[in-house]
Structure formats: structure tokens, C-alpha cells
């Protein structure tokens, strides 16, 4: 499935690489909004796909962050 940004924010940490295998609940990246950090976690087991976001990049609410493939 596709994981989208839950809010407008700034990408501050990318914790995995594109193509990396992740487990459900594993932190994938961290967004910052209004001085608060929000950890975006993998919603299921799978391989991260399409992770193109870079540290320092602004994201809009609902923008695709990455997808998970079996």
C-alpha cells in the first residue's frame, strides 16, 4: 500500500533506504511540524518502494511518501 504524509511538515530523518525490507511498526522516516516530531511507521511487513523524499524537503498533507511491496 501507499503511505502518505499525515500532515504538512518538514522531512528531518530518513531511517531506511529504498528497497529495504521493513517490519510492521518499524519507523521509516520522521517529519517535523510545529516543533513536534512525527514518526512515520511501516503499516505492514514489506519492501519500501518509491522512497524519494530527502531530508530538508517540505511535504504537503496527503503527498505520497513511499509504498510497500510484498
From Swiss-Prot:
- Alphabetical UniProt keywords: Biotin, Chloroplast, Fatty acid biosynthesis, Fatty acid metabolism, Lipid biosynthesis, Lipid metabolism, Plastid
Recorded hits in Pfam families, A to Z, give: Biotin_lipoyl
What are the GO cellular component annotations? Answer: chloroplast
All copies of the Biotinyl-binding domain together span 1-69
- UniProt-listed GO biological process terms: fatty acid biosynthetic process
Transmembrane feature ranges = none
Q: What is this protein called?
A: Biotin carboxyl carrier protein of acetyl-CoA carboxylase
The organism's taxonomic lineage, starting at the top: Eukaryota, Viridiplantae, Streptophyta, Embryophyta, Tracheophyta
Amino acid at each position: 500500500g501507499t503511505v502518505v504524509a499525515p500532515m504538512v511538515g518538514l522531512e528531518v530523518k530518513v531511517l531506511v533506504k529504498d528497497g529495504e525490507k521493513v517490519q510492521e511498526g518499524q519507523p521509516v522516516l520522521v517529519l517535523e511540524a510545529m516543533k513536534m516530531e512525527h514518526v512515520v511507521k511501516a503499516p505492514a511487513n514489506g519492501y519500501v518502494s518509491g522512497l524519494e523524499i530527502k531530508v530538508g524537503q517540505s511535504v504537503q498533507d496527503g503527498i505520497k511518501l513511499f509504498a510497500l511491496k510484498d
